[in-house]
Design a protein with these regions (language model features):
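Short His-Asn-centered micro-motif
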Residues: 9, 49, 132-134
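Acidic, PIN/NYN-like endoribonuclease modules and their adjacent C-terminal/linker elements
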Residues: 1-4, 92, 120, 125-166
């Protein structure tokens, strides 16, 4: 029997659900629909709650530029869908002492974005694979003794490792 491994997603992968454009990722639309609908065999999918806050901050930034209240309303429209995905578990690193401690160490090691530190710390605390496109954060994780062994995958790694047969 295959071990079930936690897969912790960075904010990038939920932004399209809020109508926020992201960098071009191979077959993102096709495979993200499968991920949200069916999950991923052999994995428990986690979304740190700080990703939701980060999405709201990004919408706020768009709102400031456009002064269009519909931009902010996209959060209220998208959040029920995200919460209804049975394939995704929300993890709150702010309520997990180990995740907080690790996030502080990542911040101290030089990563400027505390939200990113909390998201990465979630992957370490859950002993899972961290799915991210953040190269700078990945580099910092590899130099910290307690985070250097965390598995880090990009979207292309996920496609190559888990969706190759599709």
């Amino acid at each position: 029997m295959k071990n079930i491994k936690p897969l912790i997603m960075d904010t990038t992968y939920i932004l399209p659900l809020f109508g926020i454009k992201i960098i071009e990722l191979t077959n993102f639309k096709k495979f993200s629909k499968k991920l949200w609908s069916n999950g991923l065999k052999g994995f428990n999918l986690y979304l740190p709650s700080t990703c939701l806050m980060e999405a709201l901050f990004k919408l706020t930034g768009e709102y400031r530029k456009s002064n269009d209240v519909d931009v902010l309303k996209r959060y209220a429209i998208a959040i029920p869908s995200i919460l209804s995905f049975s394939s995704i578990q929300i993890f709150n690193p702010l309520l997990n002492p180990e995740a907080i401690r690790i996030a502080i160490n990542i911040k101290y090691a030089g990563h400027p974005d505390l939200m990113d530190c909390l998201i990465a710390a979630s992957a370490v605390a859950l002993k899972g694979i961290f799915l991210t496109e953040d190269i700078e954060l990945s580099k910092i994780l590899k130099i910290i003794p307690e985070t250097k062994n965390v598995s880090i995958w990009s979207w292309s790694d996920l496609i190559k490792n888990e969706f190759a047969q599709d």
